[in-house]
């Protein structure tokens, strides 16, 4: 009796799984390709002269986009180096694990919420202004413009750089620290001979990653830019469609943004991407010998300053939100409508992202052709080449020729947010799926267990927690998204971030603070669910 081929894994038959993966790739290709096609057609016809819009305004916006990203990324990494060095040296520092968990929050918070936290500290009515008044030296710091953009970008990206640098420090062999202690090396010698070579190898990819995040930072620049002099390409795209309705200019800006993004990704691919492999939140004392008192004092000061820089805006969100009239806010029908809309769109986007990611992961594992498997493996990540505002702009221009774009708003928000979450979902699902396949493929083949029965009985127990993690993470990303809804939002489709932006625009700051707290709590709750699921999965694996 001939055994069933080992290729028969889960979800469906071996022939169906690559088809499902192909459909997932087709979804991404349609989403990105449709936007590009619309932009190309708009540039080449319809009476629009897109080439004429490659003018001094566009190049000024492009220069500012690059300049603010360079300034933000260099400052973020420059500040991260001493903080990461101090955190690694003080492995037994009280609250070290708490600080590292705190450093994971900025990227988990919706950008709009974090921006309000930054303004609560550095704004004209912020904490620093109040302290200066109390000291008799009143000052009104101007948070809007390049200063505010830099402060916010450092808040987002410095903690990320610290975590990546700590991962690099973890790769230093124990023997290096032993030898340094035996030779009596001082702090400068250790940094120059042991630490700097490791940091230097990580810098190109790290700076490139932070630069990419700053170039595609839409919400931060939209809220803190303060005017035409501090406008990036993505904000200019939004303004050209939402306020001026100038499709030709939007096309020129979008192609410039796309070219810049592709260039950055090419540089990242050549320099290599930083990894958090080996990173831990627990104390890992690998250094030998006791640091000098002056060195330890310096480390404590640096850690404290880094902690305050990240903690104060987060505390500002909580304090400002609690001072708002939450009872009145929660009694407004529009607020509950926005919450329900956000949850419904977020749930739909997360479900779609997990389903399509599973299709890609299953197709990759079932495919024996290495080249095709690599396409399934990297296909989801390619969507990151196009920022959400670019995809939204392309489809907005395309849909207006056939229907009212705002009628299609829910579908566009769900599909774009699902696509943007897929690279992260694939990364969470792939290890568990591959492990389950390697363990069970042969036995299931011999027993003839396949299709839905295998998924239900064999594979689902192994991938249930990763699916929960991916779902919670994707839903949190969708809840805090402003890029797509900023273009397609209207009175008929109001999400929590869109309502928050409206309240900020009408200078209802207390309402905005309350909404920011609600949005932040929702997103952080989902992130905590994902984190708990990850921890439970790790414990189960160790057992």
From Swiss-Prot:
A GO biological process held by the record: thiamine transport
Membrane topology per record: Multi-pass membrane protein
Secretion signal, residue range per the UniProt entry: none
Gene3D superfamilies named among the record's database cross-references: MetI-like (1.10.3720.10)
Transmembrane spans: 19-39, 64-84, 102-122, 142-162, 205-225, 250-270, 300-320, 343-363, 379-399, 406-426, 468-488, 510-530
Repeat keyword on record: yes
Keywords: Cell inner membrane, Cell membrane, Membrane, Repeat, Transmembrane, Transmembrane helix, Transport
GO molecular function list: transmembrane transporter activity
Compartment list: Cell inner membrane
GO cellular component: plasma membrane
A Pfam family annotated for this UniProt entry: BPD_transp_1
All copies of domain ABC transmembrane type-1, residue ranges: 62-266, 339-530
Primary site of residence: membrane
Stated family: Belongs to the binding-protein-dependent transport system permease family. CysTW subfamily.
Subunit organization: The complex is composed of two ATP-binding proteins (ThiQ), two transmembrane proteins (ThiP) and a solute-binding protein (ThiB).
Function according to Swiss-Prot or TrEMBL: Part of the ABC transporter complex ThiBPQ involved in thiamine import. Probably responsible for the translocation of the substrate across the membrane.
Protein name (Swiss-Prot/TrEMBL): Thiamine transport system permease protein ThiP
Origin species: Brucella suis biovar 1 (strain 1330)
Lineage: Bacteria, Pseudomonadati, Pseudomonadota, Alphaproteobacteria, Hyphomicrobiales
Gene name per UniProt: thiP
């Amino acid at each position: 009796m001939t055994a069933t081929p080992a290729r028969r894994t889960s979800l469906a038959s071996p022939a169906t799984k690559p088809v499902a993966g192909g459909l997932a790739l087709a979804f991404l290709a349609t989403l990105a390709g449709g936007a590009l096609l619309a932009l190309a057609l708009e540039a080449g016809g319809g009476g629009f002269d897109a080439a004429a819009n490659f003018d001094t305004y566009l190049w000024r916006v492009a220069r500012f986009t690059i300049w603010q990203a360079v300034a933000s990324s260099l400052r973020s990494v420059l500040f991260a180096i001493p903080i990461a060095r101090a955190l690694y040296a003080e492995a037994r520092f009280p609250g070290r694990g708490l600080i590292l968990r705190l450093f994971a929050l900025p990227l988990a918070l919706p950008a709009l919420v974090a921006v309000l936290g930054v303004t609560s500290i550095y704004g004209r009515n912020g904490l620093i202004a109040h302290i200066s008044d109390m000291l008799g030296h009143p000052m009104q710091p101007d948070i809007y413009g390049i200063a505010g953009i830099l402060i916010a970008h450092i808040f987002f990206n410095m903690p990320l750089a610290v975590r990546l640098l700590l991962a690099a420090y973890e790769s230093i062999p124990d023997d290096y620290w032993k030898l340094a202690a035996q030779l009596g090396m001082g702090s400068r010698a250790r940094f120059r001979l042991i630490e700097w070579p490791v940091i230097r190898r990580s810098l190109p990819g790290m700076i490139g990653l932070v630069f990419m995040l700053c170039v595609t930072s839409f919400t931060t620049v939209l809220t803190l830019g303060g005017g035409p002099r501090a406008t990036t390409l993505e904000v200019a795209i939004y303004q050209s469609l939402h306020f001026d309705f100038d499709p030709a200019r939007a096309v020129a800006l979008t192609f410039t943004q796309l070219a810049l993004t592709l260039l950055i990704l090419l540089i990242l691919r050549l320099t290599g991407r930083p990894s958090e492999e080996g990173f831990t939140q627990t104390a890992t004392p690998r250094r030998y010998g006791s640091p000098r008192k002056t060195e330890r004092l310096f480390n404590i000061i640096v850690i404290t300053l880094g902690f305050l820089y990240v903690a104060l805006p987060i505390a500002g969100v909580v304090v400002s939100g609690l001072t708002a009239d939450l009872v009145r806010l929660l009694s407004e029908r529009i607020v509950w409508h926005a919450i329900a809309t956000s949850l419904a769109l977020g749930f739909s986007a997360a479900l779609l992202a997990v389903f399509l990611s599973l299709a890609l992961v299953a197709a990759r594992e079932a495919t024996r052709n290495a080249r095709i498997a690599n396409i399934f493996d990297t296909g989801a990540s390619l969507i990151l080449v196009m920022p959400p505002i670019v995809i939204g702009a392309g489809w907005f221009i395309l849909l207006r020729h056939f229907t009212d774009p705002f009628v299609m708003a829910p579908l566009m928000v769900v599909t774009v947010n699902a696509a943007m979450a897929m690279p992260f979902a694939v990364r969470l699902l792939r290890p568990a799926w591959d492990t389950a396949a390697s363990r069970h493929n042969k036995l299931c083949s011999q027993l003839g267990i396949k299709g839905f029965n295998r998924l239900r009985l064999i594979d689902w127990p192994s991938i249930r927690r990763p699916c929960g993690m991916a779902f919670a993470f994707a839903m949190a990303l969708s809840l805090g998204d402003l890029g797509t809804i900023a273009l397609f939002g209207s009175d008929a489709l109001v999400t929590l971030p869109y309502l928050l932006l409206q309240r900020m625009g009408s200078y209802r700051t207390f309402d905005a603070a309350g909404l920011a707290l609600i949005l932040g709590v929702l997103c952080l709750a989902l992130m905590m669910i994902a984190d708990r699921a990850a921890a439970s999965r790790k414990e189960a694996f160790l057992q």
